Amino acid sequence: MSHDHDHDNDHHHDKWPDGFWEQPRRLGEGLEGHGATDDFNEGRAPGLLFPNRKAEGGFSGIQTFAKLPVALTPEDLVAAKVDVAVLGVPWDSTATGRSGTNHGPLAIRSCDYKGGYGRPHFSLDTHVDAFDELVMADYGDAPISVGNTARTFEDIRKFIGTVVTSGAIPIILGGDHAITWPAATAVADHYGYGKVGIVHFDAHADTGNDMPGSLASHGTPMRHLINSGAVPGKNFVQVGLRGYWPEQETLDWMDDQRMRTHFMAEIIRDGFDKVLERAVDEALDQADHLYISLDIDVCDPAYAPGTGTPEPGGITSNDILRAVRRLAAEVGIVAMDVVEVSPPYDDRGEITALLANRAIREAMTGIAMHRQGVTEPDFLHPYAIGLDADGNRRNQVFRRA
């Protein structure tokens, strides 16, 4: 926040450290970005910080994502050789529907009952423990300048750029969907414009030109990514669109950009598994690197009521969890965002935040599977489907004749 006015007459001024009211330093580029010269961390040996005791309970301790250790500077990420960095973007000033997604990152972190880093996080579907396979950290939240969209988006881009430059995969907790514009641009800055593809799960196309009268909106990020050249239209795969927007003119524009779009009508007709197979093939077709953008409203409001623009008739929670894991395992991802979780509209059981939390865990499992070379389509461990090591039914009971 800027404090340009004179504070000499502020009766609290003498209680603050020298320089407290000075304009914050602008974020730098690459590894000279956020945190690189943080006064609180100056002189500290780089590496991960562990704010929780080992195996801390789910609802105790300090609520980092899954009680992960903390990285505060790019140097921490590099020194610890972090594979996955979870970070929040608590921003909803570009939402046009119900507000509250600025509280999304906190809710996604705090809803988890699973317990702490150091406990087993074993996937029953795959028998892969991402927390054992990967070095992961919570990187805190991007800097936000309330009321200043241009500055905030610049800072988001640079903040995420520091993560990508360090070699870690950013998993981004939104926030409204407009943050995908600076976030995916940061990824394209690193890997090259035109080299990144996006699989976009959403009830809405988010390809508007301006909504309402503003270029920066949660209904416009995909158009801006295409128009800038960061992510060409042919590198977009969209899944789950339904409802009453966009209009034909925008759909024609999407076709002109060669976007691949799978509407709920196709999913209902052919089944989610077949459509997901098409999406995986399309994701492998064009781009060298894959970014997943998950708007939680792709799921039916029965599974995700806590969102700004709910649309009935969506996919199930099981559909999205499997889809995210499959893409991360079979294709491999370089970044992911989960956006549009609005805690004020969630139910008492926090099912929307918990679904977002589990989608991230499935992405982590998929990343670990990809690193292990477990990339066969729709892999499930034999034990999870009732088989023993030889492929026979486990503990089978034979009926008497």
Q: Each predicted region: which residue ranges?
A:
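Conserved alpha-helical scaffold segments that buttress catalytic/binding sites
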Residues: 3, 13-401
